[in-house]
Amino acid sequence: MLASAGLLQTSLIWVAYAVAVALVLLVAIITTFTWQSPHERSVTVSIVAIVSLTSLLATVFLLPVDIALVSSTASAHLGAKKDWATPERIDGILLTLKVVYYTLYSFDALLCLIVIPFAYFWYEEYDEVEEEEGTSGAGARFWKAAKYTLGFVFLVLILFLLGFFVPAAGSGNGKHLDLDYFKRLLAANKGEKALTFGVGLLITLGTFLYTLYTGAGLALLPVSLIKSAPSISAPQLSATIATDLEHNRELQRQIEMRNAGRPDGISQKDRRELDALLREERTLVRRERLAAETRGDGRSGVFRAWTKIQAVFRPLKLLGGILLLLLSILVWASMLITGIDKAANSICKEHCGYILGHINVFQPVNWIFVQSAKAFPVDYILMALLVLFFFGSSITGIATIGIRFLWVRVFQIKKGRTSPQALLIATVMLALIILAINYAIAMIVAPQYAIYGTQTFCVNAPRHPGEQPDCREHRDMVRPCSEVFSEPAAKDVCTPTVMSTFLNRVTINWPVFGAIDFWAQFAFLGVFMVVFVTSLFRTPRLNLSELDEEAEVDEEEGLLASTGRRFGATWGDITGRAKNRNGYGTGGGEGSNGRG
């Protein structure tokens, strides 16, 4: 009966994970098709991007499952293992988790280093003219892409060989190795050591991207939601453009009338002015058409209804942005507290990647997770939402900053305008960033919860040798599990999560990775603070010249509005009527243009 109860609990956790992966697949599909350019869509690129994002998010979402499974083996109130949690059952649970982890990590590395580069070169080798003439077939295209991908295959082999043969830097003797927990971390075979080296290197590379893109996105995502309402309604924009267009055509008529009947034709000065007015007229006509599409003219009633629904729910986006802003500040403060605590109180400092024995200062995010774990499955839902928040922040950062080499923008990431090459590169960047997010959440954001979950142990001496300690009458003798406790009861009850063990194994075997990953968190906090303060005091403005360039590329793209009052714009979109505003116009030069 007890064994079946344990099986039921673990099965429910895996079922919840399967549901989460299904939702992750939906998120990956929506993300891919939202950002992909419809005119350059590639089936191969779309499939690779969707599979890659699904696999990477599934890897991160395995952390709540890991925590739930190890926590389910112990009673948090009594500090003892449950009756069904025999050593054999626990070993079976940990083995299953290891198999899933290693499979997903290996698959992620395969995607990032082989599959995605192959898809990139496969798309690059496509030539529409050669395809129509039949001079280039799929076979030739395949071999060209495979030839370029061989470089990444050699890179994978070199990484594996380095990890297999190079001695682990943390294998020397030291004071920090006296504890059994750290000895078990070093007790890894050659294959695991090679895998820890490869993953540690990928996490470190991802940490640099995470510091810049996720740090900026964590501040920009809430602010963008708060400032997301267009500053001028679509009806107001249409009225303004119509006025400017009428004024433009009136000036053209005046020039034509002024030069009518001249034997030598129109003067050079008037010709230059007329050409400028004609260019401006074409721009205004495009803006007028785009504004009409934004209003829903010529669209179905469903589209127009959806536009009005979006306008109605803009206040909810404002509220959601405020809540996410508070969450960002809470996460930032928690990470700062953990970082300072680890830097000051780590039991082994840089020798093991600043592993912290136990939390010495109140850490709000970790406390929230530990307390919410009492109401299953609230903590797992919160962890999933936190992962999605970091993931969404990373996308926001990449979209805002773009794909750059040093300070030069190579690719631009925009909704509905991202090229397949940019989408694949962004997918690799997200892959590396997600690995870094995995480290940050487990080691910095909620360290105690991510390592032992809700597990506790009883320090009361057992009545008979071989029995579990009994704290039913001594609840004050129940202690949270920690790496530094050496009591026999702690060794018997406390089971660390597979993820934390793997990450700690990376940092203790390769301390340079641990040191870089740890100190990069302070750079992450600095980037967040700079972007956060800047975005609060910087009024977003609309670059109409940029919109005109987009309109020339794709004249069917909807136009978001520019300057004015946000709440007046919202009401204008709901009612469908333009509000009179004297003195407003778009023809006053680029200096008067604004971004909504």
Swiss-Prot record:
One of its GO terms (biological process) is protein localization to vacuole. The chain crosses the membrane at residues 13-33, 45-65, 99-119, 150-170, 201-221, 318-338, 353-373, 381-401, 425-445, 512-532. One of its GO terms (cellular component) is vacuolar membrane. It is found in: Lysosome membrane. Keywords: Cobalamin, Cobalt, Glycoprotein, Lysosome, Membrane, Transmembrane, Transmembrane helix, Transport. It is a multi-pass membrane protein. InterPro entries: LMBD1_LysCbl_Transport, LMBR1-like_membr_prot. Its main location: membrane. GO terms for molecular function: cobalamin binding. Residues 576-596 are annotated as: Disordered. Glycans are attached at residue 543. It comes from the Eukaryota. Residues 584-596 have a biased composition (Gly residues). Belongs to the LIMR family. LMBRD1 subfamily. Probable lysosomal cobalamin transporter. Required to export cobalamin from lysosomes allowing its conversion to cofactors. This is Probable lysosomal cobalamin transporter. It comes from Podospora anserina (strain S / ATCC MYA-4624 / DSM 980 / FGSC 10383).
